[in-house]
């Protein structure tokens, strides 16, 4: 089953077979060993997935959660390929998929939303994929959220297994080819070591193929005949030629871990960092009394219809200068919101210091879930006021950064805010709107 001399055409055919979910008897993409020629390991087994495979072998109902950003969210991507492989490879086990992905978001939002999006559904295995979207965050910030994710999962159920999976974008390709994980994955590896969580770097194989000249990382398939084209945008794998590589790597190491079985509850050791976000809370606004200046969006509103599964309630100000006042004791306050054509500017005052926050960017020609944080605060009492002035600004100039033109000005006429929840590490002391 170990293919060493695959030419590009044969390799491409292999990828198509995986993507079409055929019985996985000959669907390897030359993932020869745990360590690539550069000496960079793509897999660390550590404690494996014993509880997951115990249930699989017994044919019991098994729930698999995929937790990450747009790379994992992709409809015809590694998520669906690996989940379909599980169903085919273990036909006597009923599998349920939990798709807990949100494009463009990292582990800093994930740790807050996971109670609703994952834990309420009682998963048996959670794949965690945030290496690309956590780019730019400090090691300490990644530790806070990623360690919080682990500890929340095991507090909810110590028999839930976790597997870290790492992806890559073009900006870290050379680093991986030089034999080093990107900084985000290096930080996550230290956490995985601490908690003995298995990890799979799907990007190591991609980097190897690119270095050997078999793969073009970013390009157009029609301009690169005879080669695998991984992506057209430097990040998101193509469903026919990029995602199957990711899927084949994960499949290989799931197979390698399947003999390590048994009911082995995971204990919680002393945390790596004391200020990790295991106490993070997603706070609902539904308990607030009615306000003349705020309203809950109706069920038929376009934003509610798009995001009701993860955001059951979404609120917006109805008058200019509507205000939200929050008092809390803690280190972090965030806002889980939706940004898009009708979103605008916020005036945020933290402990008397005022700042303008723009909830509109060059991608806001469509609506998407997002978040904004006030973090790194002292663990003390803080007061925050958010005012929504609804003043206009040049949205066309912002969209022009991506060569997007406003063809219907009415879609962008409002300058409001779509708020779903507060995100808090600490204790809420008071909350009101007026």
Q: Where in this protein do the model-derived segments appear?
A:
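Extracellular serine-dependent O-acyl
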Residues: 161-166, 182-228, 244-257
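Solvent-exposed loop/turn segments at secondary-structure junctions
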Residues: 70-73, 102-108, 132-137, 160, ...
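N-terminal secretory targeting modules
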Residues: 1-67, 72, 77, 87-93, ...
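Oxyanion-hole/transition-state-stabilizing segment in secreted/luminal serine hydrolases
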Residues: 65, 77-80, 93, 107-143
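Mobile, glycine- and charge-enriched loop segments
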Residues: 74-108
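Active-site segments of SGNH/GDSL-like serine hydrolases
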Residues: 150-186
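Structural recognition of the beta-strand scaffold that forms the well-ordered cores
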Residues: 63-67, 96-101, 125-130, 161-166, ...
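Alpha-helical scaffolding within the catalytic cores
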Residues: 44-53, 83, 107-120, 143-152, ...
